Amino acid sequence: MKKIYDLWVRVSLIKKIGIGVVIGVMLGILAPDLTGFSILGKLFVGGLKAIAPLLVFALVSQAISHQKKGKQTNMTLIIVLYLFGTFASALVAVLTAYLFPLTLVLNTPVNTELSPPQGVAEVFQSLLLKLVDNPINALATANYIGVLSWAIIFGLALKAASQETKHLIKTAAEVTSQIVVWIINLAPIGIMSLVFTTISENGVGILSDYAFLILVLVGTMVFVALVVNPLIAVLITRQNPYPLVLRCLRESGLTAFFTRSSAANIPVNMQLCQKIGLSKDTYSVSIPLGATINMGGAAITINVLTLAAVHTFGIPIDFLTALLLSVVAAVSACGASGVAGGSLLLIPVACSLFGISNDLAMQVVGVGFIVGVIQDSCETALNSSTDVLFTAIAENAFWKRKKA
């Protein structure tokens, strides 16, 4: 037994997760009635979601309270990369929709409990209100905009505190980080359970009716991950970006794919940034911020499904309108984390550009929920892995400028 344990300890986490995925698929196909097994996945995701707000608050307040005057954090470049990457993803989705026009079979059931925002202004109003949320409520409800804003305020206030107080804050951040390490080490079991639940509840063939839509969505996201993002990286760093890109996809995207939660993946991303050797002053802020505004995958979902609706209803569209759609989708996607239902519930905002009624737009949302098992997984994997990628290339660019 000890030999098996020692062998398991020596195997890398990624290989363990791969083994968990294979076992989860086999159990989902061969023994779908083991419904009690799904609780392990819920516990794993619940643990990550529970610790993530505390981790963000502890790390951000600690980083800012210890920050020396004039120290570079590269946040301006990172935010520009987040916004540009989201817009580029939206533009790629428009081009994909032109090359592979989709039509949808509507009259799908719609979740009437969810209501879409009435426009981009409402999305941003919601985000601004989240900035001034009660700090305890922000932590309890995982409102990362609120957690970030209060962590920054507390960090600034703690700059004037004694060294003993700052040391206490640093210890709290280190303890929280250690708890995260323990939870992440349970990823193989948690992901095995999540894969089992997906296969046992949905089957492997349930999405065949929407195969082309899934292919377009996933293909666009893969193109952005393997072509567009590396192109952005090489323009900034002047180095081969693929070792970093593939590492981000492997160590961040893989976990995000199965948890389907950017919030749950924040601890994973922070640990990856630490392993890469990035500055904690930077990534403790950029990673939770990226989970909120870096939404390339969401922009792709909004544009692909909106243009599918446009083609379904035979509405003509010119290039300038498509460009405007990309801007609206990018801006809306940046607020996706502040909307119940995420990117899918922002589709009516984009559809309104073409005069598509809210009732019809919500039917398109219904199609999105049907393919959500795949769409949401790929979207989260792209969004979350890009947070680490853009943080890393911004820091790389800073050190190159400094050496020059």
From Swiss-Prot:
Chain ranges passing through the membrane: 17-37, 39-59, 75-95, 138-158, 179-199, 212-232, 287-307, 313-333
Keyword Nuclease: no
GO cellular component, one term: plasma membrane
Any coiled-coil regions, as ranges: none
Swiss-Prot/TrEMBL catalytic activity: L-serine(in) + Na(+)(in) = L-serine(out) + Na(+)(out); L-threonine(in) + Na(+)(in) = L-threonine(out) + Na(+)(out)
A Pfam family it matches: SDF
Repeat keyword on record: no
Extent of the signal sequence: none
Principal location: membrane
Molecular function in Gene Ontology: amino acid transmembrane transporter activity; symporter activity
Similarity comment: family membership: Belongs to the dicarboxylate/amino acid:cation symporter (DAACS) (TC 2.A.23) family.
Purpose of the protein: Involved in the import of serine and threonine into the cell, with the concomitant import of sodium (symport system).
Protein name (database record): Serine/threonine transporter SstT
UniProt source species: Streptococcus pyogenes serotype M3 (strain ATCC BAA-595 / MGAS315)
